[in-house]
């Protein structure tokens, strides 16, 4: 089914704003805009190869990031960026198909620069998504990972996600190897209040 062009949701959550991480590091949070393609591309290309291995799409490719920006403009995706010194240091994104039978679901994607890990940035970004999800009509967030992404699985479990399924040989990594896919979900209503 082809998606109809949908206008982006007008979010009430204030952006941009500065937050302090657990170690006192300040980062600026704001929403990604179509004009951020080159900055997001620079961030993606700065990530270690291991981080890119299991991404759903290759965000180091200009075309992929341009399509991402088009999805933002069309209202299918909302991405929160974390910046320091005008450089992207992390993002959380939720993709939402507003016209399908899964219109109550949002797919979560989070990526944090290595220098900003273990500081709580991934948690901050995830909470931003949970805070804005109700405004988008999202009732449940879905996260996909491979079983060897142990840190990511632990993070989403701590955030209230539960494992729903393991799909065997379901994804192919960048080297062409098949991997299992772990599907985890979390009800937005259960966590949205803690995100505000």
Place the predicted regions along the sequence by residue.
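Glycine-rich phosphate/pyrophosphate-binding loop shared by adenosine-nucleotide-utilizing enzymes
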Residues: 25-27, 85-91, 179
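Conserved acetyl-CoA pyrophosphate-binding loop and the N-cap/start of the following alpha-helix
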Residues: 116, 120-128
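C-terminal "cap" of GNAT-fold acetyltransferases
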Residues: 169-196
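Conserved GNAT acetyl-CoA-binding A-motif
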Residues: 126, 133-145
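A short beta-loop-alpha structural element at the N-terminal edge
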Residues: 27-39
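Acetyl-CoA-dependent GNAT
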Residues: 57-104, 109-113, 126, 187-189
């Amino acid at each position: 089914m082809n998606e109809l062009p949908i206008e982006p949701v007008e979010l009430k959550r204030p952006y941009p704003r500065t937050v302090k991480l657990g170690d006192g590091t300040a980062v600026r949070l704001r929403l990604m805009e179509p004009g951020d393609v080159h900055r997001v591309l620079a961030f993606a290309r700065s990530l270690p190869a291991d981080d890119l291995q299991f991404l759903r799409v290759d965000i180091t490719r200009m075309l992929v990031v341009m399509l991402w920006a088009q999805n933002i403009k069309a209202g299918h995706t909302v991405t929160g960026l974390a910046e320091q010194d005008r450089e992207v240091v992390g993002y959380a994104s939720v993709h939402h198909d507003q016209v399908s039978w899964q219109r109550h679901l949002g797919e979560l994607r989070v990526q944090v620069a290595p220098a900003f890990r273990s500081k709580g940035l991934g948690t901050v970004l995830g909470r931003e998504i949970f805070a804005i999800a109700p405004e988008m009509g999202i009732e449940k967030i879905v996260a996909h990972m491979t079983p060897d992404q142990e840190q990511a699985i632990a993070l989403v479990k701590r955030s209230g996600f539960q494992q729903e399924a393991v799909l065997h040989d379901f994804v192919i990594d960048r080297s062409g190897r098949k991997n299992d896919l772990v599907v985890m979900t979390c009800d937005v209503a259960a966590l949205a209040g803690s995100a505000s």
